[in-house]
Amino acid sequence: MTEGRIMADAGKRWDFWIDRGGTFTDVIGRAPDGALHPLKLLSENAEAYDDAAIEGIRQLLDAPDTAAIDPARIGTVRMGTTVATNGLLERKGDRTALLITRGFRDALRLGYQARPDIFAKEIILPEMLYERVIEVGERLHADGTVETALDPASLDTDLKALRSDGIDAVAIVLMHAWRNPDHEVALAEHVRAMGFGQVSVSHEVSPLIKLVGRGDTTVVDAYLSPILRRYVARVKDALGATAVGKAGPTLQFMMSSGGLTAAERFQGKDAILSGPAGGVVGMARTAGIAGFEKVIGFDMGGTSTDVAHFAGDYERALDTEVAGVRMRAPMMR
C-alpha cells in the first residue's frame, strides 16, 4: 500500500486514546467525522470482558462480541497504563534471578547504605525484586580489559536449576560492562539459548558507570517486562496492530518520561509511571488551552494517587525510587 493510500484511508478511521488504570479504564475515541466519544469501564470485569481497553474500542466501534475487531476501522491507539506501576506496587512481576560478577552478590541489597531514618534502631532492608542470585566467574578492569575470562557453560547447572524452579526472567549485571559489554553479550546469548523468556542486560537497559544504579534498573526491567509484553501482545493481537508507518492500526504507549514509544519497544523500566506521566502531559496541555501557565495536578486512582506541578517546563528525574525500588530512568515528576 502506498503512503498516499495510507494517508487517505487514515481519514476514514477511528483514533483512540486510552488511560488504563488499576480500577477504571478511560477511553476516548475520535470518530472519522472528528467527534469525540468518551467511555469509562472497570479495568477488571472478567464476567463481561477480557480486557477493558479492547472492550472500550469494541463498544465505540459498535463491533459485535462474537466477531474480531476490524483493523481497517482503526488508525492509531495511544495508551497509558498502570500495568507496570501496579505490578511493582503489588509485587506481581515475574519471578526473577540476578546474574552478577562473583563477589558482588549482595551489592544491590547493600545499595548505597542509605538510612531513610538515621535514628532508627532497627534497619529494615527493602524487599528485593529478585529471588535468586548466581555469581558469575568473570571480571573486567575499569578500562574494560579482561582480568578473568567468562565461561558461560560453567553456569549451566545453576541456570538449569532456575528453569526447573520456574524462574524465566534473568537480569545480567556485570562489573564495568558499560565500558566493555562483550561478557554481558556472550552471557545473554547463552542464557537465551537455554530457553529463558526474559533476559535484561545492564549495558542495554541502563549503560551507566555505577553498578548499583545500573543493576537496580536492570532488575526492574527483568521483573516487569514480561507482564508488559504479555499485555501488549494481547492488545496487538486483538487490534491487528502493526509497526508505525505500516498499513494497519498503530499502537503506541506512554513512557514514564512523557513521550510515546512503539508497542514493540515498550520496556519495564520505561513503564513505571506510564499512566501518571500521561496525566501530567494532559494537565499541562489542558491548562495551556485555558490560559494557565502554572498548575498543580492531583491524579487519584484506585491503587495510587499522584501529585504534580507544572510551571512552564516538564520536570524529569533520572534517579527515582518507587515503592521502595530504586531505578535510573527518565521519569516525570
Model-derived features: positions:
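N-terminally biased helix-coil "hinge/interface" segments that flank
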Residues: 2-333
